[in-house]
Amino acid sequence: MMKTILALPYPPSVNSYWLSRGNRRYISKRGQLFKKAVYHYVLENNIQKFGDKPLEVSIWIHPRSKVLMDLDNSVKAILDSCQDAGLFDDDVQVQALHVFRTDSVKGGGCSVIIEEFHPV
C-alpha cells in the first residue's frame, strides 16, 4: 500500500489563496508561494506519485498562534497544491479526508499523509 508523508509550510486560507478581479479568479501571491513550496518539497524528496488511485488524506494544521481559525479554510489550498505538484491527478480522488488542529508552533505548518484508499 502506497503512503507518503509531507511536512509543509503553513497554508494560506481559501480566502487568501484565491482572489478575484471582475469576473477573473486567480491565485494570490501567497497562494503561489505555497504552491511552489509544495512542488519543491515533492521534487526534492522524490515523492512517489499516486496517479488516479482513490486516496485517503489526513492533514494536521499546526497554527502559528493560539488564535482560533476555521479548520477547513486551508484544506483546499493544500489539496490543490498537492495536485498541481503531481502527487495525484485530481482532488476528486480523495475518498476520505481527516483534518486535525494541533498546538500552535512558531511559524506554523502542516503535516499531510496521503495513502491509497481501501474501503472496509
Regions found by a protein language model. Name each.
Residues 1-120:
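Acidic, proline/glycine-enriched N-terminal capping motif
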